[in-house]
Each structure stands twice: as structure tokens, then as C-alpha cells.
Amino acid sequence: MPRPVSVVFVSLIIAAAVGVWGVFAWNGGFEELDAIVNRHPSTGIPGLNHFPSLDQGLMSMAAFNLPVVGREPLFAEGRHFMAQLLANVFAIPIVLLTEDFRAAPGSVARYSTSWGVFSQLATSAVMCPLYGVCFSRRSNPRRVAVLPGRSTWIVLISVLIGYGAPAMLIFDPFSWGLKPQIWGVLAFTVYPLYVCLTASLLLKTVSSKRGRASRSVQKDSDSNSSLHYVVAGIVGVAGHLSYIGFHLGEHTGTAATRPDRVAQLVLRFLQIDYVITFAAMLTLAWHELTHSGRISLKPWRVAGYLLLGWLFIGPGATLAAAWALRERWIRQDTQEEKKRKL
């Protein structure tokens, strides 16, 4: 008999297929995107004119985000929503890469890059529930390994560079024009590869210096074990509160211009994707917290606190806080196990 949490994850996968992709296709979203590609058939990337099919395929990928984040015409609601979405999603690659680092060989958590690429191709609303199904089936909070060495810093720097930098570029922050913005959107599409590459380079650098810093590694790891979650929480709260502030200011300002139909369709797509994504990740957080054996609250109360966290500090910060608490318990369990062996 399937476990209740697995039923929730499978239901979210179905909801993602129907509510995200199904609604978008039903409303003619793909036809609208084809019209954008017909107006801008090329990405403008040097050399790709010799490969028109590849060029047009990449342009189709970029065309999805352009109606929301583009400057001409400027869609303020879309840009603000995308900004807070990316700020909250910052916590997800933090979690994926952290679990990748500590997972046992053969565990599905070891393939964070593959999960990230799948998320970019199929949307995070499909990936996150599927990840939750696989992760929760094998997860045992009392047998999870502590992050080795300076992995906290490696995770944080890798996500800041690999995810944060491309995420900024999609908004054309320097007003370079349409072509550079298209390149920025495409760069963000493959951000999991940048995260993986940065992490690999940092791991090699740390490994080469491990012999000289063997004594300080454990102390450094203990004192900064939740630093990456703290940063993810700050980023998520900032995005959440800025979006609330934007809406409060919108009611006191002038009426906003009505966006194009395609921009409305993409925004609706992203909103549904956003809700399902964090419903899945917070369900996974709920599972990890309630199965740790350390929490005295009833499961429904834990779910209530997670929901309140979503409303008041944002889902990204709530996810980061839940995972930081889990990290603390893992470290305490490890220390208690060491004391018993002495």
C-alpha cells in the first residue's frame, strides 16, 4: 500500500502535468510562443546561423521567458513575480546540492545536476514532486551523514555563481538590449551545469589543500553548518517581501497597462508552477521533520507552521529554515553517536 506522502507527491505530479502544461496548451500558449519566434527567428549567437534548426530551437526556449522579463514591452507584474520566484527557488538548488554531497553512492540524491536539468526542461513543478517521491522512499533522518569538511561553503558559492549570476542576467539589468537578454535567458536555462562545474572546481581546490588544514576543517564545518540555509532564507525573505511591497504600492499608484495575452499566459503558467513546486518541497520538508523522531509537535501542526511560513516569510525561506533545523538534528545525532562509542 503506498504511503500517504507518496500519494501527495504523485498527485502533485499529475497536477503539474494538467495544471501547468495542460492549461498552457489549452489556452493556445504554444501558438503564441511560435508567433514570438516568427518575429525573432534567431538568437543572434555568433556561428549558430549555420545551424538554423538549433538556433530556432534555442530561440523557442528563450521565447518562453521573454514576455514576462522583457523590457519591450515592460511587464512590471511579470518581472516582479519572476524576481521573487527566482529568489525563493534559490533554496532548492541549495537543498539538492547539499543532499548530493552527503548521499550514499547509488542514491538518487547524488544526481543533483540531472535533477536540475530535468527541472529546466520539464519545469520544477514536475521535478520536485518526483524528487520527493524518490528521496522520501529511502530517507532515514537518523542515518543521514553530516556534511563533510567545507561543503557548506562549496554549496553556497556554487549556487551563488551558478544559479544567482544567470538569474540576474535574464532581467537585462544593464539595459544591453534584446539579443544579450536572449543570451541571458539561455544561460539561465543551463544553470545546473554551472552549479555542477563550480562545485567540481571548488572541491578540487579544497581537496588539494586538505592536508594543510585538516585540524581546522571540522571546526569550520561545525560553525558554518547552516550558513547556506541562512543565505537562502535571507534571499527568499527579500524576494517575498519585495513582491508584497510591489503589490501594496501598485494599489496606491497609477493603473498598470494591460500586458499582452502571451505574457498573461506565461505568468499564469509560472504562478501554477511556483505553487506546485513549493507544495512539493515543503511536503518533503514536512516528511523529514516529522520522521526525525526529535519533534514533539503533531504532524498537522508542523504542516500548519510550514504554511504560515510560506505566507509570512515566503516558501523559499521556509524551506531553508526547515532544512537548517534538519541539519542541526543530524549533527546532534552524529555527536550523540560518537559519545556512545567512546
From Swiss-Prot:
Positions annotated as glycosylated: 224
EC top class named in words: isomerase
UniProt topology in membrane: Multi-pass membrane protein
Pathway this chain belongs to: Antifungal biosynthesis
Key words of the record: Glycoprotein, Isomerase, Membrane, Transmembrane, Transmembrane helix
Regions that span the bilayer: 5-25, 81-101, 115-135, 151-171, 182-202, 229-249, 269-289, 305-325
Enzyme Commission numbers on file: 5.4.99.-
Molecular function GO terms recorded: isomerase activity
Location(s), subcellular: Membrane
GO cellular component, one term: membrane
Family statement: Belongs to the membrane-bound ascI terpene cyclase family.
Stated role: Cyclase; part of the gene cluster that mediates the biosynthesis of the tetrahydropyranyl antifungal agent restricticin that acts as an inhibitor of CYP51 and blocks the ergosterol biosynthesis. The highly reducing polyketide synthase resH, the short chain dehydrogenase resG, the cyclase resF, the FAD-dependent monooxygenase resA and the enoylreductase resD are required to generate the first stable intermediate desmethylrestrictinol.
Protein name as catalogued: Terpene cyclase resF
The organism of origin for this protein: Aspergillus sclerotiorum
Lineage: Eukaryota, Fungi, Dikarya, Ascomycota, Pezizomycotina
